[in-house]
Amino acid sequence: MAEKNKKEHPVTKDRLHPRNKHRERYDFDALIATTPELAQYVTLNIYNDQSIDFFNPAAVLCLNQALLKHYYGIDEWNIPEGYLCPPIPGRADYIHNIAALLGTSANDVIPVGPAIKCLDIGVGANCVYPIIGNNEYGWSFVGADVDPVSVASAKNIVDKNKVLQGNVEIRLQNHPLDIFYGIIGEGERFDVTICNPPFHASAEDAAAGTLRKLSNLQHKKVTKANLNFGGQHNELWCEGGESAFVREMILESKKFAASCLWFSTLISKQTNLQKAYDQLEVLAPFDVRTIPMGQGNKSSRLIAWTFQSKEAQAKWVSARWK
């Protein structure tokens, strides 16, 4: 009888990048072998598949710990209560797409090694983008955040994992309205900047969005969110929402045009894409790219832009990517 209820799943998650380690379904046996604590959260669902309760913050946290240890060599990873526990496959996809983007500046040869420097705007308490980027490509990272608790948490993750020490630096942004100012030092160079910007425009919007997410997971209306699930205010919302945040980033990027080869950001809301294009058109970068991304039923995209001409890109690569 169980076989009749067995749901057919695709062998791979085709919407994820070909280099993404998470294209196949989670191998819970392998993950439990790496992190035995995960076993208590793994059950068989109605389709007779191993899974966890994604509504349970402790289960999601333990799954992330197992994924980061099994695939990325991170022995110690935790986040403060109430902070965002990100989906690892989607975060990995951003990194792999950025690697391909950097390759376009070097005859499609993806750059690897610590000479490649990436700036993560809004690194968060979880420090996941630097973890993945350093493991997959050997890049060095600077992670910036406006929240002192997030900064302390990210620093703690770096300090507790030797593979990150010397490769990841965490900086506090002391001026919450600034993006690059106060973070990029004089004469400092970054090969790429990445960002997963706050989505919502207010605390109320963020709370409503969290309830919608939980309702979708539970397939029923949820009226109260678990504090562990949604994330802190600076992770989820800012004045003006995603559109305003990206607008400020684009404006500041012009001032740092010579400091960064490529700028990039995720755009979750389709309607914000044209606003970003319009803003970029005013500043006239040399090149603008849009890269579609998706996981499951969720679609998003990242946009990237550079003020460097092809000749300038070639000089940049020749001087730095050795």
Swiss-Prot record:
InterPro entries xref list? METTL16/RlmF, rRNA_lsu_MeTfrase_F, SAM-dependent_MTases_sf
Q: Which cysteines are joined by disulfide bonds?
A: none
Q: Where does the record place it?
A: Cytoplasm
At the top of the EC hierarchy, this enzyme's class is: transferase
The record ties this protein, via CDD domains, to: AdoMet_MTases
Known EC number(s)? 2.1.1.181
| Recorded GO CC terms | cytoplasm
Catalyzes what?
adenosine(1618) in 23S rRNA + S-adenosyl-L-methionine = N(6)-methyladenosine(1618) in 23S rRNA + S-adenosyl-L-homocysteine + H(+)
Query: What keywords would UniProt list here?
Result: Cytoplasm, Methyltransferase, rRNA processing, S-adenosyl-L-methionine, Transferase
BP term (GO), one: rRNA base methylation
- Output one GO MF annotation: 23S rRNA (adenine(1618)-N(6))-methyltransferase activity
Query: The organism sits in which domain of life?
Result: Bacteria
Task: Sum up the protein's function in the record's words.
Answer: Specifically methylates the adenine in position 1618 of 23S rRNA.
Family of the protein in this entry: Belongs to the methyltransferase superfamily. METTL16/RlmF family.
- Supply the name of the protein: Ribosomal RNA large subunit methyltransferase F
